[in-house]
Regions:
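Extreme N-terminal starter segment of soluble prokaryotic enzymes
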Residues: 1-5
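C-terminal accessory helical subdomains adjacent to catalytic cores in phosphodiester-
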Residues: 14-50, 57-212
Length: 212
């Protein structure tokens, strides 16, 4: 049984979550105990497995499958990551109107639970194993404080801002780049400090079990 399974929108998100977990638990070798199940990842090539597809709609479909339920049972924890920038799409249907970051996170979590239980009631029995990483409005907003200081956590336009502010690393959407961009998350104190600058990042950190 592995420590963590990952169900994310894409491989860039997987790279960041892996570094967060290694930093939070102060164990760089923890990566060997983490496996990406959506999208499946080719560790040798460090890219999405050939024929695999990412994206939020594919992620939603995965959450309702027997394979997802089996992987939750077979792993100590399953982390589900999704950005909220798509929440108002008709196929997701979570309004952002007049919601705080915390309220939006809860609405998105409720929507994901509906998907998990859409074919078979499952969540209530295994909820202690399922951890939600809801990035408002994109995971780049979690990375941004590493490259640009700000009193208020930015929640929109983060990818474009990250591209401008990252001077040493060219920001392109692949695994290796995001592994480098999030490298400082391997340092526990740095991780905790950066998470405190973004409400949705802090919410994810708060959901992580203290010991594994």
């Amino acid at each position: 049984m592995l420590k963590f399974g990952l169900a994310c929108e894409g491989v860039t998100d997987q790279a960041v979550i892996e570094n967060i977990l290694c930093g939070f638990y102060k164990d760089k070798n923890l990566k060997s105990e983490i496996k990406a199940f959506q999208p499946l990842f080719d560790a040798t090539q460090q890219k999405q497995l050939e024929g695999e597809f990412g994206g939020w709609e594919i992620l939603l479909k995965f959450l309702s499958t027997k394979r997802f339920r089996q992987e939750v049972i077979n792993n100590q924890y399953m982390i589900i990551q999704i950005d909220t920038d798509i929440s108002e799409h008709p196929n997701f249907n979570v309004s952002q109107h007049n919601l705080s970051v915390e309220e939006l996170i809860e609405k998105v979590v409720e929507r994901l639970i509906l998907e998990i239980d859409s074919k078979k009631e499952f969540y209530s029995k295994y909820k202690e194993r399922i951890i939600f990483a809801i990035s408002v409005h994109s995971l780049e907003c979690w990375l941004l404080p590493l490259y640009k200081s700000s009193k208020n956590g930015k929640i929109s336009g983060c990818f474009e801002t990250l591209q401008r502010e990252s001077k040493k690393i060219k920001v392109i959407k692949d695994y290796k780049t995001y592994e480098k961009l999030s490298h400082d998350f391997l340092k526990y104190k740095k991780l905790i400090n950066i998470a405190s600058k973004n409400s949705s990042f802090q919410a994810f950190i708060n959901r992580l079990p203290k010991k594994i």
